[in-house]
């Protein structure tokens, strides 16, 4: 304190101090030790800003969380409203949304899908904590729908006799639940054929499944 009887503490002065007070007058002097306790004041940490993100289904991406504490306290991270397949390990957020993350569940989403605008937003809260202080940020991650090509299951070669009728019955489906159409090319352009004498031989027919965008 010196001789001014004043002390303006800083954030680094937390602790217990013994202060000697000396009183002196005409013909006497007196010393006394006074215990002074400076309580710690925990300062707010600094949480670096996280921007909103736009990603695609089946695309893995990461967010590196960064925060600092002016008192050099240890900083931990947590998150609220995490999607089921997302992971936060220490300060690294990792997510690879599956192809089923964005779905057509209403008239609006079906209309958006028609114009290839289908997406879904996820509001995730990230929290940085140190000692008695914490700070949070809400981040919107928008996942865009990714179309997958229709699937045609393999089928065994077809063998018929001359004058027999042929009917092709492919097993085809769309993993996104879209309607599909089938077309045929090569030896025939439809799914049926009536063979004639003289048709003996090996022929190839190409079956194509399309959802209007992918095949």
Give names to the regions the model predicted:
Residues 60-67, 165-172:
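A short beta-strand segment in extracellular, disulfide-stabilized domains
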């Amino acid at each position: 304190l010196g001789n001014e009887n004043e002390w303006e503490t800083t954030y680094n002065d937390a602790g217990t101090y013994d202060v000697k007070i000396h009183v002196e007058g005409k013909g006497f002097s007196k010393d006394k030790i006074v215990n002074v306790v400076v309580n710690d004041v925990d300062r707010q940490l600094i949480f670096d800003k996280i921007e909103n993100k736009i990603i695609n289904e089946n695309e893995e991406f990461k967010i590196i969380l960064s925060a600092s504490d002016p008192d050099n306290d240890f900083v931990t991270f947590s998150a609220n409203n995490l999607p089921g397949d997302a992971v936060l390990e220490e300060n690294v957020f990792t997510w690879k949304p599956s192809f089923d993350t964005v779905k057509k569940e209403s008239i609006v989403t079906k209309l958006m899908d028609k114009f290839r605008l289908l997406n879904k937003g996820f509001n995730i809260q990230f929290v940085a904590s140190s000692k008695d202080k914490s700070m949070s940020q809400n981040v919107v991650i928008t996942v865009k729908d990714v179309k997958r090509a229709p699937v045609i299951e393999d089928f065994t070669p077809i063998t018929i006799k001359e004058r027999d009728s042929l009917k092709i019955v492919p097993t085809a489906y769309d993993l996104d639940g879209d309607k599909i159409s089938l077309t045929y090319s090569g030896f025939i352009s439809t799914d049926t054929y009536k063979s004639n004498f003289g048709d003996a031989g090996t022929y190839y027919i190409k079956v194509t499944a399309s959802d209007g965008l992918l095949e």
